[in-house]
């Protein structure tokens, strides 16, 4: 089979013109295997097997056109979720189910989303969730062992990979990983305070090298609602609430307290809320604001804080959207 010739820059991708994220339809799996099933391919690798021809520029254009189309589409988002750990992904899952009409962008600094939810405590495999967080697992379709007051997922990666795959399947959700939030977009309110109106982003590798390279300006995403779930204080953790302190919107961080599972999980879920207009905070980032206890290797509060964050966002969405017209 002859290799393909050069393809014009404005030619269709894979034979179809690129549409918006809401219009793209899934291509049937058999198209990629030239109409063959796996059973037909099995044990016939020496009988004329070959991949369909491709030119390298087609790969480049297939990636870049789609990515920059997404950047254009989500430059004006309805909700931005900062941090794709267990809380952020749970938030995205609930919002994607409840409001398929909303454009939801997830910004994750790491190449690999999921945060610390790929393993349980001390790098062990199993994930423990206290009831009633088993309701979230049932909704996801993740199997577990029932131990009475808590349940155990055999491997944390089973939970995280299932949640991630379901989130990414929503046509109205886009994950921008390897991308960090460097600042918050603000608007002054009538009372002289501020409202959060979006995020300032950059490639994570650029963010990490501002000190040793010349000025590398960022990009922006406008949104009436930002939900921050960046976790414990750290290089990228608790970023949004630390920025609120530096902007004098909150006096200081409360500082996360020691481990108390019984106190911590209830507090994180119940206090998930809008901290300042336009910014909802959930998960362990919230413990840094409130001076709450850490809960250690139990993940139910992360999932249910995400559920509550989605509820809080929808309560104020219409009001914040009306305010975010400028």
Swiss-Prot record:
Binds 1 Fe cation per subunit. Substrate binds at residues 87, 108-109, 116, 181, 217, 232, 284, 294-296. InterPro entries: FAD/NAD-bd_sf (IPR036188), Sti35 (IPR027495), Thi4_fam (IPR002922). The modification 2,3-didehydroalanine (Cys) is found at residue 215. One of its GO terms (biological process) is thiazole biosynthetic process. It catalyses: [ADP-thiazole synthase]-L-cysteine + glycine + NAD(+) = [ADP-thiazole synthase]-dehydroalanine + ADP-5-ethyl-4-methylthiazole-2-carboxylate + nicotinamide + 3 H2O + 2 H(+). Its EC number is 2.4.2.60. Its cofactor is Fe cation. SUPFAM superfamilies: FAD/NAD(P)-binding domain (SSF51905). During the catalytic reaction, a sulfide is transferred from Cys-215 to a reaction intermediate, generating a dehydroalanine residue. Keywords: Cytoplasm, Iron, Metal-binding, NAD, Nucleus, Thiamine biosynthesis, Transferase. It is an enzyme of class 2 (transferase). It is found in: Cytoplasm; Nucleus. Belongs to the THI4 family. PANTHER family: THIAMINE THIAZOLE SYNTHASE. This is Thiamine thiazole synthase. It comes from Sclerotinia sclerotiorum (strain ATCC 18683 / 1980 / Ss-1).
């Amino acid at each position: 089979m002859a290799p393909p010739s050069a393809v014009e820059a404005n030619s269709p991708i894979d034979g179809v013109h690129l549409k918006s994220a809401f219009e793209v339809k899934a291509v049937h799996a058999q198209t990629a295997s030239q109409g063959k099933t796996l059973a037909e391919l099995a044990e016939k690798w020496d009988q004329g097997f070959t991949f369909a021809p491709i030119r390298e520029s087609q790969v480049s254009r297939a990636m870049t056109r789609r990515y920059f189309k997404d950047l254009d589409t989500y430059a004006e988002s309805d909700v931005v979720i900062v941090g794709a750990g267990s809380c952020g992904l749970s938030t995205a899952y609930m919002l994607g189910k409840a409001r398929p009409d909303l454009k939801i962008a997830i910004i994750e600094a790491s190449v690999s989303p999921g945060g610390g939810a790929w393993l349980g405590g001390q790098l062990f495999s199993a994930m423990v969730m206290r009831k009633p967080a088993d309701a979230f697992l049932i909704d996801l379709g993740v199997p577990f062992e029932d131990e009475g007051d808590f349940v155990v997922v055999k491997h944390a990666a089973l939970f995280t990979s299932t949640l991630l795959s379901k989130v990414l399947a929503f046509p109205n959700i886009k994950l921008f990983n390897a991308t960090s939030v460097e600042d918050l977009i603000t608007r002054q309110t009538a009372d002289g305070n501020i409202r959060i109106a979006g995020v300032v982003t950059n490639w994570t590798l650029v963010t990490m090298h501002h000190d040793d390279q010349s000025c590398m300006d960022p990009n922006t995403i406008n949104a009436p609602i930002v939900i921050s779930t960046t976790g414990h204080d750290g290089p990228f953790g608790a970023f949004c609430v630390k920025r609120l302190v530096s902007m004098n919107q909150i006096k200081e961080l409360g500082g996360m307290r020691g481990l108390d599972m019984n106190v911590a999980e209830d507090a994180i879920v119940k206090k998930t809320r809008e901290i300042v207009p336009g910014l909802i905070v959930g998960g362990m980032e919230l413990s840094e604001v409130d001076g709450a206890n850490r809960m250690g290797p139990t993940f139910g509060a992360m999932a249910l804080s995400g559920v509550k964050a989605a509820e809080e966002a929808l309560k104020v969405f219409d009001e914040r959207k009306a305010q975010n017209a400028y």
